Curated annotation (Swiss-Prot):
A zinc finger (RING-type) spans 282-322. This is Uncharacterized RING finger protein P8B7.15c. Keywords: Metal-binding, Nucleus, Zinc, Zinc-finger. It comes from Schizosaccharomyces pombe (strain 972 / ATCC 24843). The keyword Lipoprotein does not apply. It is found in: Nucleus. Residues 5-79 form the DWNN domain. GO terms for molecular function: nucleic acid binding; ubiquitin protein ligase activity; zinc ion binding. One of its GO terms (biological process) is co-transcriptional mRNA 3'-end processing, cleavage and polyadenylation pathway. SUPFAM superfamilies: Retrovirus zinc finger-like domains, RING/U-box. Disulfide bonds: none annotated.
Length: 482
């Protein structure tokens, strides 16, 4: 009659079974051996195999203990306390341990390094406990490792370092000629010696940080030559390609240009100022009216943008007299006020003494496009409209021939006449054309020769000429020409 023992690992969901012949049970040694064989756990040198009762969680530490049939056990695989000394190896080899209890195997001799450190009472209790758990064994292993590493660190801290220059590398060969005038040792930042013969190569206290900053990417106009700095004042000192000590100086010209542009007034700045005459101010923003226009209801002066925004926000209601249905297309531009405001802006810009030569450029760049279009419309519709139109026509008339002459395709160069070939035929070796095959050249030459010997027949006979006899007509019929 056969019996069954059920087992499963801690992370396993469904239990597995071991079938054996007998009615009593199976020894712990045989159960562990069957588990290793079924699960293919290897030779068992790197782990220990533990069995626990599934109901009471009691460990089966005696290999000779008989586990009754139909018993469920929990299997745990823990790391070996020493590498390659796992206790599961004896179950694979088939050599049982006759001493019995596994608790003796837990009480292994403490390593020599561990004996030097005092053992706490908690650790001694864990070792002396007959039912030591898996966590206690792992904790003991970690404690031994940490003690060994701590002792190693203490030895390393008290040891004296031995400096051996060029221990792992071969000394570089020093050139036999003196360094060039602009050569710099980029190890110490000094001149007069090669980097292979630098005095700091044999210095054990040298940190190895480079003492030289290169001027890569910095224009020469931004560099200024200085004297050789002291040992501790070389923070901002660099060395150029010629070996001279330089420092970076600021771009004074660009900074002055920026400051002058910032100090110069623009048209936008003038429009934001308080107007010198209240009649030129906008009714809403109280500033110079930009693109001045008037409302048809109360005839007040507004900026074009201010009045349009106010009408759109108030459902086309005048902000001054509160009249309804004031549409945008009913606003009347005041060209007279626009010219007066432009004169005020120009006078303020002209009175600015700083960078007066750059004021016109900044004014034109900052002038809105609507104002530029309005100026063009005023010039075209003003008293000088005929002069403006004539100048525009003149500029267009002078620009078109120049454009056409620039875009004209150059004429084909005259080709020399080749004997035996028609005049418009290009030469054979003309640049840009492929070379003509010899057979084609012979065919063209033969055709020209045939045409010269036998010119085409034409109807040059006079009107009163006699008709040729029928025999001649039959032999050589005349060709019809149009």
């Amino acid at each position: 009659m056969s019996g069954v023992i059920y087992y499963k690992f801690k992370s396993q969901k469904d239990p597995s079974r071991i079938t054996f012949d007998g009615t009593i049970g199976m020894s712990v040694f045989d159960v562990k051996r069957e588990i290793i064989m079924q699960k293919k756990l290897g030779n068992g040198l790197d782990f220990d195999l533990l069995l626990y009762n599934a109901n009471s969680n009691e460990e089966y530490d005696d290999d000779t203990f008989i586990i009754p049939r139909s018993t469920s056990v929990i299997v745990r695989r823990v790391p070996a306390q020493k590498s390659g000394k796992g206790t599961a190896a004896r179950y694979v080899s088939g050599a049982p341990k006759t001493t019995g209890a596994r608790s003796d195997s837990v009480k292994r001799p403490v390593p020599m390094l561990q004996k030097k450190a005092p053992i706490t009472s908690g650790e001694s209790n864990i070792n002396k406990s007959p039912s030591s758990s898996e966590d206690a064994a792992i904790q003991q292993m970690f404690q031994v490792s940490s003690d060994q590493w701590r002792e190693t660190q203490d030895k390393m801290a008290s040891a004296t370092p031995i400096y051996k220059p060029n221990q792992r590398r071969i000394a570089a060969s020093v050139p036999d000629k003196p360094p060039p005038p602009g050569y710099i040792c980029y190890r110490c930042g000094q001149k007069g010696h090669w980097i292979q013969a630098c005095p700091t190569n044999a210095d054990p206290n040298y940190d190895g940080k480079p003492r030289v900053k290169r001027t890569t990417g910095i224009p020469r106009s931004f560099l200024k030559n200085v004297e050789r700095p002291a040992e501790g004042d070389a923070a901002n000192i660099m060395i150029n390609a010629e070996g001279d000590y330089v420092v970076v100086q600021p771009d004074v010209a660009s900074w002055e240009t920026y400051q002058s542009r910032k100090a110069a007034l623009t048209a936008n700045d003038v429009y934001k100022m308080q107007p010198p005459n209240i009649s030129l101010a906008c009714t809403l923003c109280k500033k110079l009216a930009r693109n001045a226009c008037r409302t048809p209801c109360c005839d007040k002066l507004f900026c074009e943008e201010c009045i349009q925004t106010a009408l759109l926000d108030s459902d086309f209601e005048c902000p001054n007299c509160h009249r309804k249905d004031v549409l945008l297309d009913t606003l009347n531009p005041d060209y007279q006020k626009q010219r007066e405001i432009e004169a005020v802006v120009k006078s303020v810009l002209g009175s600015n003494s700083k960078n007066s030569d750059k004021v016109g450029t900044s004014d034109d760049n900052n002038t809105p496009m609507s104002e530029k279009r309005k100026r063009e419309d005023d010039d075209a519709n003003g008293p000088n409209k005929f002069a403006a139109r004539s100048s525009a026509v003149f500029s267009k008339a002078t620009a078109e021939p120049a454009f056409k002459s620039a875009m004209a395709i150059p004429d084909m160069p005259s080709m020399p006449h080749v004997q035996g070939f028609p005049a418009p035929f290009p030469p054979f070796m003309m640049p840009g054309l492929p070379q003509m095959p010899p057979m084609m050249m012979n065919a063209i030459a033969g055709q020209v020769y045939h045409n010269n010997r036998n010119p085409p027949r034409t109807n040059s006979r006079p009107s009163n000429a006699s008709v040729p006899p029928p025999s001649s007509l039959h032999k050589n019929p005349p060709t019809k020409t149009n």
